[in-house]
From Swiss-Prot:
PROSITE patterns membership: RIBOSOMAL_L16_1, RIBOSOMAL_L16_2
Record-level GO cellular component terms: cytosolic large ribosomal subunit
Family under the similarity heading: Belongs to the universal ribosomal protein uL16 family.
NCBIfam families for this protein: rplP_bact
CDD domains, alphabetized: Ribosomal_L16_L10e
Protein name, entry field: Large ribosomal subunit protein uL16
Keywords from the named record: Ribonucleoprotein, Ribosomal protein, RNA-binding, rRNA-binding, tRNA-binding
GO molecular function: rRNA binding; structural constituent of ribosome; tRNA binding
Protein purpose: Binds 23S rRNA and is also seen to make contacts with the A and possibly P site tRNAs.
UniProt subunit comment: Part of the 50S ribosomal subunit.
Amino acid sequence: MLQPKRTKFRKVHKGRNRGLANAGSDVSFGTYGLKAVTRGQLTARQIEAARRAMTRAVKRQGKIWIRVFPDKPITEKPLEVRMGKGKGNVEYWVALIQPGKVLYEMDGVPEETAREAFALAAAKLSVKTTFVIRTAM
C-alpha cells in the first residue's frame, strides 16, 4: 500500500479541504483520465483497490498512472478509551482530493476498454468522478 517512506512529523492537524485542484487537473501522461468531480479524501486502500480493478479490466495491457499519493496520516484512538491523554496512533494514510484533480491516467488501450476500467475503479472510490480524454498532445 502507498505511504510515505519518511515524514518530517508523525501526526498532522485535521485541517480543511477547500478550493479547486489547480495542479494535476489535466491529463498529462496518458490518453484517458479519471477526474474527481467532488471533494473528499482517498485512503491508500481505496487507491490500491481501484488500481487492481483497472489492471484486471484491461487484462494487464497498456499503461496506468496513479496521479495521487496518500501523504496525510489519519489517527484513531482505540475502542473504549476515554477522551484526552493525547492524540491517537496513526492508523492509515489519505490523499486529499479537490474537484478537478486527475486521479488515474491510462494509455495503450481502446477508449471503450478505458471507460469500462475507469467505471470499475470509480465504484471503489469515495468521490464522484468523470471520464476525460486528453485534448492536446
